[in-house]
């Protein structure tokens, strides 16, 4: 899980979602693409 100021989709399987006012990126193909804004 990377904590970044601006989250971006890395591949086409990445999805941007909001959970409890936190913007996250989840990826079904590569777990290393997981990100959180903060």
UniProtKB/Swiss-Prot annotation:
PROSITE patterns: RIBOSOMAL_L36. InterPro entries: Ribosomal_bL36 (IPR000473), Ribosomal_bL36_sp (IPR035977). GO terms for molecular function: structural constituent of ribosome. Pfam families: Ribosomal_L36. The lineage of its organism: Bacteria, Pseudomonadati, Pseudomonadota, Betaproteobacteria, Burkholderiales. One of its GO terms (biological process) is translation. GO terms for cellular component: cytoplasm; ribonucleoprotein complex; ribosome. This is Large ribosomal subunit protein bL36. Belongs to the bacterial ribosomal protein bL36 family. The gene is rpmJ. HAMAP family: Ribosomal_bL36 (MF_00251). Keywords: Ribonucleoprotein, Ribosomal protein. It comes from the Bacteria.
């Amino acid at each position: 899980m990377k904590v970044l100021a601006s989250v971006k989709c890395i591949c086409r399987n990445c999805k941007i979602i909001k959970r409890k006012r936190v913007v996250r990126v989840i990826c079904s193909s590569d777990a290393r693409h997981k990100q959180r804004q903060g």
